């Protein structure tokens, strides 16, 4: 009798553990939402609280931080990916394989975006509400409209746990430098560690993702090494 009870408890534990792991992977891949807070801009709760503190500190220094983009689910990332794929292959007449590499200069394959985690934010200056195409690198450089914000973040963001994800280290490969993209390290480092346990091939080799037939084993290995892992060393 005791053996049966112990076996039952073991099976229940295994089932709960499996369900939790599955849920975690679904969150990391953007299929399910993490514990998000916020109105129109949603973030993981610790990230949300840390950003609010940073925003107040910046305001006290005369700098107005605004989040241009935060959490992004799988379906949204898939729409971005497929729209770009269609544009590059029809308007710009790129070969499908070329389109894939053009997209991953700045955009991730659905299921692999750090924005799925709710720990990533794209930051701009709130004083330019009518500005279009805000996520342009030159706008964050000297004489650019977001230089004031960028300069403040360079000095202060790490005090609040935010690190630029794709920095301008000349030795770094993968995604282009994004001066607007910051990650809340205390949570995102844990998220990355969990994400690396997933089967990347199963995550991205889906018919609904345009161009996925070009995701060969060599491509997937390169994507993992250079795009997922070649980030700011302080986020590993």
Listing of model-derived features with the role each one plays in the protein:
Residues 17-236:
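Extracytoplasmic cell-surface/polysaccharide-interacting catalytic and binding patches
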Residues 1-26:
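Bacterial Sec-dependent N-terminal signal peptides
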